[in-house]
């Protein structure tokens, strides 16, 4: 009799994983994704290397590809983690930082830099200082934009989205206006900066980007339990004692840091994070951010490396990776939106 | 130690003003908040629960100012459930109720927490449904799951906005009996918005009647259950008769 009481007590638990089946599924998916990630990484590194295996040039090529892969990993971490955290904060699984005007913010900052400094100034703007300056500008502006949008000033999500899109549009025209006054060579410099490209990502930024990303992700990881509660919405979170407004500002600042880092590396991407997060919700089926984050990251990394592998090694169009991923992500976005039928 | 409201006011617009309200809700026992639609019951309740900013005035719960005290500390003495609830996260009943322990566990559930969770679930007869997802429940079952979450929070003060919404007769009576028990046996203070005046009269110790943003009456059920008083509050002809279990308001 005591034994039955004991076993029922054991079965009654409340964790983020509901039962053995759920656990098995989560582990299985993570294993498959992990294997795919390792396989693709290996494939990208070694496939079709023209030099003799093991020779110096061979290692050189592998090293260059390794830099691309590290960039991909950083970008995947940034977009996946940022999008999951952002969607938790806005309590909506359609909106992303990109949709809410982040890309336009980046464009306006870059355009302003070229506009004010000219070709000479802008091309001189490489290295740590300018990188950090540009990051700081993006983070500050994006944090202000997002916390303002989320301040509860807008009674519903539609108005908030509309305001976000309009702000994006206004910033876009502002950039357009400045771009018209640039000389052709200035415009060239600018276009090179605006278009995302993994093949010639700014790998020299990696030594600064990686520590930033590691610290931000660690901070979000430690806040994961609070994020789980925030996902329940404002009033429930407040009832449970979360300092809601303060937490939102912190989350938005961390999200902005991540997206700004990824954008500085490869340019704006709107839908990669959406793709990774949506797949993680679907396959993870859990409220726990500690389980969602790793899965979203693996999805993001696998998708990016797979596109990179196919486009670079098979179709010889390495520059188009971000474009193709955005195309797929945008389509998935539309499908999800149409199937849900609401925001 | 009780809930006190001093000159509490909320101005939604020039026309819609709630308050000023000055009153004291006794600790221990059940206080029912009644009144017509739009009277300001939810507004007052959510302000006590610090979910809505107060324009002027102060509210204290157990001596603590709800606006200025840390939200973390308030969450251990007061829990509040709103009229409408909706989550984007997909949760089972048990996971939802588990969140009620957050103020105490900060998300790391101990065996002790699991005990509170099981108790709250059993208390609301959700034991068989505990592993179901919320989107697989009926409206009334979901409503009970929300109340279970608030009870698992195990606070001295519990504020509930129309928790009988969607409940059938059996479950409405059960819930009121359970809330009564929580007040009598565990010494909880329960403030509850009710639309059924007969439920309010039978199960509560005090009734707080609101109309047009003001408190118009605050007293025992016997004081409120009068023809003129009820007719005045609800803008509709009410007759109080002697029922088998006390006064009964007939308004149809
Ligand atoms: N966010 C808001 N903005 C403007 N007016 C509001 C808002 N919320 C409530 N009101 C108004 O304030 C008044 C009181 O609303 P409240 O929700 O407190 O009423 P209630 O007594 O709970 O009514 P019910 O029985 O219908 O739940 C109503 O006239 C309502 O229209
Ligand atoms: Mg109400």
Predicted regions and their residues:
Chain B
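Conserved ABC ATPase signature
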Residues: 133-137, 141
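ABC ATPase nucleotide-binding domains
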Residues: 233-252
């Amino acid at each position: 009799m005591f034994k039955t009481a004991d076993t029922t007590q054991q079965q009654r638990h409340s964790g983020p994983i509901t039962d053995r089946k759920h656990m098995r599924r989560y582990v299985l998916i993570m294993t498959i994704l992990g294997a795919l990630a390792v396989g693709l990484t290996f494939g990208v590194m070694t496939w079709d290397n023209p030099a003799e295996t093991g020779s110096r040039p061979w290692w050189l090529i592998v090293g260059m590809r390794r830099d691309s892969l590290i960039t991909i990993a950083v970008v995947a971490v940034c977009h996946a983690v940022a999008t999951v955290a952002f969607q938790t904060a806005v309590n909506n699984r359609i909106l992303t930082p990109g949709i809410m005007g982040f890309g336009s913010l980046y464009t306006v900052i870059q355009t302003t830099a070229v506009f004010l400094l000219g070709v000479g100034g802008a091309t001189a703007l490489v290295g740590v200082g300018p990188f950090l300056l540009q990051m700081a500008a993006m983070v500050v502006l994006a944090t202000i934009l997002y916390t303002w949008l989320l301040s509860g000033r807008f009674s519903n999500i539609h108005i908030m989205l509309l305001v976000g899109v309009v702000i994006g549009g206004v910033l876009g025209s502002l950039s357009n206006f400045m771009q018209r006054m640039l000389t052709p060579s200035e415009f060239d410099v600018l276009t090179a900066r605006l278009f995302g490209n993994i093949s010639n990502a700014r790998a020299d930024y990696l030594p600064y980007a990686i520590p930033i990303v590691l610290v931000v992700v660690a901070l979000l990881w430690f806040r994961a339990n609070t994020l789980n509660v925030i996902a329940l919405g404002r009033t429930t979170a407040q009832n449970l004692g979360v300092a809601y407004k303060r937490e939102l500002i912190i989350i938005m600042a961390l999200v902005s840091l991540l997206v700004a880092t990824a954008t500085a590396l490869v340019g704006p991407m709107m839908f990669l994070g959406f793709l990774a997060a949506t797949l993680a919700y679907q396959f993870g089926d859990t409220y726990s951010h500690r389980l969602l984050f790793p899965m979203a990251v693996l999805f993001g990394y696998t998708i990016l490396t797979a596109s990179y592998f196919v486009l670079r090694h098979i179709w010889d169009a390495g520059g188009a990776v971000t474009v193709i991923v955005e195309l797929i992500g945008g389509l998935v976005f539309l499908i999800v939106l149409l199937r849900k039928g609401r925001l | 130690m009780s809930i006190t409201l001093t000159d509490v006011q909320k101005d939604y617009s020039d026309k819609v003003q709630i308050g000023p309200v000055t009153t004291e809700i006794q600790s221990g026992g059940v206080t029912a908040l009644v009144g017509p639609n739009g009277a300001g019951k939810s507004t007052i309740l959510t302000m006590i629960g610090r979910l809505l900013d107060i324009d002027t005035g102060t509210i204290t719960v157990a001596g603590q100012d709800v606006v200025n005290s840390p939200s973390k500390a308030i969450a251990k003495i007061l829990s509040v459930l709103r009229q409408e609830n909706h989550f984007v996260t997909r949760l089972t009943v048990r996971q939802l109720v588990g969140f009620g322990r957050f103020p105490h566990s900060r998300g790391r559930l101990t065996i002790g927490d699991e005990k509170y969770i099981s108790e709250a679930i059993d208390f609301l007869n959700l034991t068989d449904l505990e592993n179901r997802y919320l989107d697989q429940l009926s409206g009334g079952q979901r409503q009970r799951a929300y109340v279970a979450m608030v009870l698992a929070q195990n606070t001295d003060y519990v504020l509930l906005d129309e928790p009988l919404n969607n409940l059938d007769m059996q479950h409405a009576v059960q819930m009121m009996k359970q809330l009564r028990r929580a007040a009598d046996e565990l010494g909880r203070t329960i403030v509850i918005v009710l639309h059924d005046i007969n439920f309010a009269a039978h199960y509560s110790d005090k009734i707080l009647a609101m109309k047009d943003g003001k408190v118009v009456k605050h007293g025992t059920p016997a004081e409120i259950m009068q023809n003129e008083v009820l007719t005045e509050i609800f803008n509709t002809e009410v007759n109080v008769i002697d029922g088998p279990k006390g006064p009964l308001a007939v308004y149809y």
